[in-house]
Each structure stands twice: as C-alpha cells, then as structure tokens.
A protein has these predicted regions:
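Gram-negative host-targeted secretion-system effectors, predominantly Type III and Type IV
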Residues: 1-178
Length: 179
C-alpha cells in the first residue's frame, strides 16, 4: 500500500480527467489510513502515555509517510480552532496543499478523513512524532546515498584519470629479450 501515490485532486477533477479509479483507490487508502491512525493511537495509549514511536511505526509501515502525513494535514486543517493542536503543527498543516473535495456545493468530502475518534492532544503528539520520524528517515536515506557515492568514484573522476596505455612496455607479463 505504501507504493500507491496519494491522489491529491478532488473527485470532480478526477472525473473530468478520466482518473476516477486513481481517486477512488487513493480515497479508500486514505480512509483506511485514518482508521489505522485512530486504532494505533488507541492501542499504544496506556496509563496516560502515548508510545508515539510505536504508533507512528505501525501506521507508517502500513501506509507510508506520504499518505499518513496527508491524512494528518487534513485533520489538523479541520481542527485549526482546537487549542490542543500545537501552533507548529497547525503551521505545518497549512503549508500542505489540500484541495477542497466538494461536489455541487456539498460539504467538503475531506471531513471523512479527519482523525476524530481520539483526543486531539494525542493527535497532536502523533503528528509531531510522524513529522519527526519522516525527517529522521530522510536524513538516513541521504546519509546512505552519500556513503554509496563516497564508496564509488564518479564516472567523471574516472574520465579525468590519465589513460593507461595497454602496450608491451606497460604490461607486467612483458619480458625483455635477453641479449
């Protein structure tokens, strides 16, 4: 499920552009992700403490960070009035482009993606934990990519090296004739 991209556009756009299948699949996964977030928070909340890293890992492993953060951005945007959501998370959520998903003036269909079966304070912790985990994963990926490129010389470096001619004078197996 993590390899299926989030479809960002509203249903009306998808219908006009022949992409309803992509829209429907993405929406189905978004709803499942929302439910998984609610379930993970409930499962990892005990004795007034949320095991944020375990809850985030459970959802991110199943749906990926892109979809998880998309659903969380919708949630925070819809709960912008709630004081239990931090200003930092509200600012982040407002920076994520979310299209309204209305058909013929109806209410925004994104309201069905709002994580609302758990306390907003716990949602705030989950959002912060997810953003942090994604940043750490990006750092690790960058370090792995950097170490891979450090191990292998670039093709440009290979091309800059002087050419070694393959001649008898340079050959290790060349024996000078005895005189």
């Amino acid at each position: 499920m993590t390899n299926i991209p989030v479809y960002l556009y509203p249903q009306e756009y998808a219908a006009e552009n022949g992409e309803l299948d992509k829209y429907r699949l993405s929406r189905k996964l978004n709803l499942a992700c929302k439910e998984a977030i609610e379930q993970a928070i409930g499962a990892h909340y005990s004795e007034n403490r949320l095991d944020t890293s375990a809850a985030v890992k459970q959802v991110a492993d199943a749906f990926g960070y892109e979809r998880t953060l998309y659903v969380l951005a919708i949630t925070v945007q819809h709960k912008g009035h709630d004081g239990r959501i931090s200003d930092a998370n509200k600012d982040w959520a407002m920076s994520v482009p979310i299209f309204e998903d209305r058909i013929d003036g109806s209410a925004d269909n994104n309201r069905f993606l709002v994580v609302d079966k758990v306390n907003p304070g716990l949602v705030d912790l989950f959002v912060r934990g997810t953003r942090r985990a994604q940043a750490q994963e990006k750092e690790q990926q960058a370090e792995r990519a950097k170490s891979k490129t450090a191990e292998k010389p670039s093709i440009l470096e290979k091309l800059k090296r002087p050419v070694q001619r393959n001649s008898p004078n340079n050959s290790a197996n060349f024996l000078e004739p005895e005189l």
